Amino acid sequence: MNQMNQPPNKCQTYLNLGSPLSAISSSPDSTKLIVAGRDIVKIVSVQNNEFKVTSNLRAGKTQSLNYTGNDCCWHPSLLENYRFLIATAATNGAVVIWNTVREGSKSVERVFTDHSRAVNKLAWHPEKLDCILTGSQDNTLRMWDIRDSANASKITFSPKSESIRDVQFNPSQANQFAAAFDNGTIQLWDIRKPTIAVEKITSHQGLVLTIDWHPEEKNIIASGGRDRAIRVWDFSNGKSLNNVSTISSVSRIKWRPGNKWHIASCSSIVDFQIHIWDVKKPYIPLFSFTDHRDVPTGLIWKSPSSLISCSKDSHLLLNEFQDSYKPYQHIRTTGITWNVNNELASINDKINRTQSNESLPSLSTQFPSFFASFNVPTPPPLPPLVKVEQGIMNIYTPKYQNSEIVYDEKYLFEHFAKNYRFRGESFNQLCDHNQFVSQSVNQHHISTMWSLLKLHYSNLDEIQQHKELIEQQQKEELEKLNNKKIEKQQPQKLKKQQQQQQQQQQQQQQQSQQQLQQPQLQQPQQQQQLQQPQQQLRQQNDKNIKEQQIQYIENLENKQLDSKNIIDNSNDSNQEININKEDKEDEEEDDDNTSNNLDDNQMGDIFDPSNDMMTAKEPPSSSLMEFNANDTGNDQFCNILSAEAVTPLVSLPTSISLERQKSTDNISDNNSNVHVNIKRQNQPTNNNNNNSNIDNLEKKSNKSKSTKENKESSLTDQNKQKRNDNKEKIDNNEIDNDNKDNNDDDDNDVDNIGEDNDEINNNNDNNNNNNNNNNNNNNNNNNNNNNNNNNNNNNNNKNNNNDNNNNNNINNKKNKIKNKSIENKKDILDKKEINDEDNKSNDENDSLKILIPCFEFEEFNFQPIITDMLEACIEKGDVQTCVFIVLILGRYMDLNIEKHRLTTWFGSYIELLQRYKMWSLALEVMKYCDDQIINQASKRHTTLISACSSCGKSIPQNSIICEKCNKASSKCSICRLPVKGMWVWCQGCGHGGHLEHMKSWFIDKNQKSCPTGCTHICTPFKK
């Protein structure tokens, strides 16, 4: 049903006293009021909700400051001698006791003037009826006895603080009172201990202007201060129970009777309204009285539904709740909440905000005399009445067909902490599992991180296994070495034992020989007979060794004839020898260049312009390679190839060509360091090098003599003849040996053939060089020299023909051996090529072209991206993902992250786990962290705080008895005796006892509940 807020009826009671009011107090029977101000002290009767002034206590008195009313208080007793007593406090520090029965000047009974400054508050003792308590600006509290006029101040309290703003006796304990101070503290005093305060609470930031004890709850007091707050305190523990924020400073507060947590307040400035608050709902007041035109100064509850107030606007008002402004009725009721399914429910009142046509009467028309009494603008009208309809509740869910579930941060943290893994599986499995966990809660950016880690570091497990295998092999090798050492040591011990046994046997034999009576001459004869055949064998071996040495010396003499002849003629032809040395050095350099060019051409890479790729050429086949085992390398004309026959090309080194080159090198190494010589047919000679040598000779031959040249030519002819004779002998011997051992020495035969052919070519080159040199010399020398040169030419031609004939005979004899050796060599190379290429098929027999790119990619460094990724997670506050990535990758590599940063990451994550009470997960992270600071944190900072099982207060170390309840905290719940040693307790209820007693109770007797009878189930239910 639609309901309308009705306007307030004319039910207010007010009284204009003509002067600003400062305080108000009620009689014990609530029929009269005492109102005090700067210029008035009057008694007002309250009958039928109407105010009437019955007496003026200041009538006919002089304008003395003793009679000004800064505060007033009616005696709370109903006894005849006390119910008419009234006390007032003046601004000059005087305290006046009034008797309302008397009239005129006799109404003043006592005047106390011990305070030096203004008295702010008065309070009668609830039990000692003749005593009154005062608080002053002079920083003292005084207890007065109204019966003693000479020395009335019986007790003086010196709190050593600032000015006292308010004092009140505790209704539950008459000997205690509370005082409010300007320094923001509230102190609890006992009149029996006037030297020191019992309790002190710092309640406000600034002045504490008012306090009020709760009428029902013990030790609970409310305070209001200049910091615009109302606070509720419990003096038993000094804790703040509630806090109400207002818009201005609070000058007076008063608990509402009949309503436990309702309290009224008024302000000293700005706010002229009186508010009634519910301290459990501190944001909006329940009721507000808006009739005063100036700040209220006093509050008295006449009943739970009516409030009497005075103000500096000189008015005394009786406020009824039915006339009050109710903010809750003028605001829209709204409720909002979440459920477990992430659904949002809200409820709102449907309000019709259309204005009603009826205009509301103003308060000035209702109370003309009230508003005409002072020049105050008329108050604004109340908010317009609004038609309220029935509330509407709406339920919203973020889960639609095309939307995703929204997860709370707390839920995500707990979900990841419980489901993430960092050990027990391989790297790829851990990444897959963590990716699935993050994807199940729609955290796609985190799942992408795990997938990237798996994509780049997919081979970490294989690398780790390889390292472990290497470590195992090293360990096994060390064990073998140790075992060998042990085995070597054992035979030494055995040898020592055997030697000792032999010595013992020899001693026994000597003893036995002495006992024998046979002659000793027979024994040397027998020994001589045994030694004769051994001497014959030694003599034969010595003869064979001498014959071999003689043959070896003869061969050396034949080979060193050239060098001896050259040394004999060295003193006569130093210049020519130097020329020959320079020629030899040039020729050796040419040989090196040609050999290098050949290697580059045959083993290097050739650019193929058709496909812009590099083709790696196959190593030369076995038919083009011959192994010479007898090549000594002493001849300077061996292994010379013409530079014109080779066209050097720029080669790009590739990994595949290098691997093939290594494979061919391995083949040559396996053949006992055999020199490789490459045969080439129809190669033109390099005339450039020869021409350069000829030019050098022409420059230097002018200084030489013709006789020296003739001697040199004759020496060379003799040396060549001796060389050829030696070669024929060596080759014939080799042929005979090859016929005997064809199957074992095929490789050496082929190499010998290659050597013979190379020497033929070298001899031809030497003859040509001699011819050229002789022709040049003919131009500069005499006719005698010409004849000598012609003779040399003829001799050279004859020698060449002899060499060719000898070599042809040798080649004819070795054709069969050569064919067999080549076939065997092909088989060996084919097998090794198959092993090197990992059983790959060859498309071509002569050469295999492999496509290789012209450039190589550098290895991509993924580690800086990982560090940036971790830093981005830290900036988002996701320390959890960073910790798990470090735990997983840290086992395989060094992440190059600063140690103190890792310590802060792990420390933050462990602290979060401990806040969520995930103790086991926090300890697991500590255990497997590589940082020693984190790993040993549980060992250094593990503390156990015990609490009393009866009151719950913590017990200090090395103490058994609780300080609060004075009970032994370690009593057994079954035997009720103190426990010394092992203590077992339930973490739910805190009860425990001896280990044996707990076992007998829960295991033997099969009990589930606590033995103390606290109804707690200490053991889980069994399914």
From Swiss-Prot:
Residues bound to Zn(2+) 3: C986, C989, H1016, C1018
UniProtKB keywords: Lysosome, Membrane, Metal-binding, Repeat, Transferase, Ubl conjugation pathway, WD repeat, Zinc, Zinc-finger
Residues annotated as binding Zn(2+) 1: C948, C951, C962, C965
Biased composition (Basic and acidic residues): 696-742
BP GO annotations: positive regulation of macroautophagy; positive regulation of TORC1 signaling; protein ubiquitination
Assigned EC number: 2.3.2.27
Residues the record lists as binding Zn(2+) 2: C972, C975, H994, H997
Pathway: Protein modification; protein ubiquitination
WD repeats: 16-54, 64-108, 114-154, 159-199, 203-243, 245-287, 291-329
Segments of skewed composition (Acidic residues): 584-593, 743-759
Spans through the membrane: none
Region feature (Disordered): 563-621, 661-824
Superkingdom field: Eukaryota
Segments of skewed composition (Low complexity): 563-578, 682-695, 760-812
Biased composition (Polar residues): 661-681
Claim: Transport is one of the keywords in the record: no
Entry's Gene Ontology molecular function annotations: transferase activity; zinc ion binding
Pfam families: Beta-prop_EIPR1, zf-RING_16
Zinc finger (C4-type): 947-969
Subunit structure of this chain's protein: Probably part of the GATOR complex.
Protein function: As a component of the GATOR complex may function in the amino acid-sensing branch of the TORC1 signaling pathway.
Family of this protein: Belongs to the WD repeat WDR24 family.
Protein known as: GATOR2 complex protein WDR24
Gene: wdr24
